[in-house]
């Protein structure tokens, strides 16, 4: 992964791993098929931290790329949020994410997404509210450095008839679901208040979206309320490193962003937020690899 990041001319790269879950009931179907238990997840995470710190020491000394070591929060419930606060002390940064609602994965497949919606009362609107309320608890308790895939709840949403009588694709969340929009704005304002960043996460494109997370309505809301963006590939394999960043950059320009932000370590080893001009970044030879 790091070798690919260097080959692709990245100057800063954050290694992350999902924090372990507390009980076997939260294992994904693919993990169950492999015979995993939470003990495996805990051991894997501990091994990750050791290995990542070793890579970080080597690469940061060499100076070609700066590596940060972080983790991704599993904002399943308050117990997992409390566990995440412990891991936060051991890492350079954390990504605040929600992958479960009512203990059910919302990013694995449509069937489980439907189960989560049923648990929320059977409507997509109610599921959105539960998702953004849980996300708020993650943000409030942990103040994550980066908010992960802000609107992940949309990944498996199909274009169905809403209670308003319109297709979901025709729903303007701000106008038609003001109760949901209020929660979204609340979450954005909280992140802005402590200086957190929002991902422009390119993994949505490889999963079939036309844009990164978040989609344009929420991205514009983040801009409106003073939020800042960083780039993320959410890579789970070396072939996904910086994948579709050229399309993310088109999105950056569509949004009219003037600056993009990233995390880095200062001379004291403290994680800080750094700012780069979109105009200057656009001139880098980095983009030649996408032509």
Q: What is the meaning of each model-derived region?
A:
Residues 1, 154-156, 160-291:
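Charged catalytic cores and adjacent phosphate/nucleic-acid-binding surfaces used
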Residues 13-15, 67-71, 94-96, 146-148, ...:
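Hydrophobic faces of well-ordered beta-strands that scaffold small-molecule active sites
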Residues 76-79, 215:
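Short, well-ordered alpha-helical microsegments
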Residues 26, 78-83, 105-109:
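Short, conserved acidic/polar surface loops in the N-terminal third of protein domains
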Residues 20-22, 89, 93-189, 197-200, ...:
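Divalent metal-binding pocket/active-site signature
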Residues 2-3, 44, 49-61, 66-68, ...:
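Histidine/acidic residue-rich metal-binding segments in metalloenzymes
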Residues 1-77, 86, 161-178, 202, ...:
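An N-terminally biased module of ancient metal coordination in phosphate/nucleic-acid-related enzymes
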Residues 76, 103, 267-270:
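A short acidic, often aromatic-flanked loop/helix-cap motif at beta-alpha or helix-coil junctions
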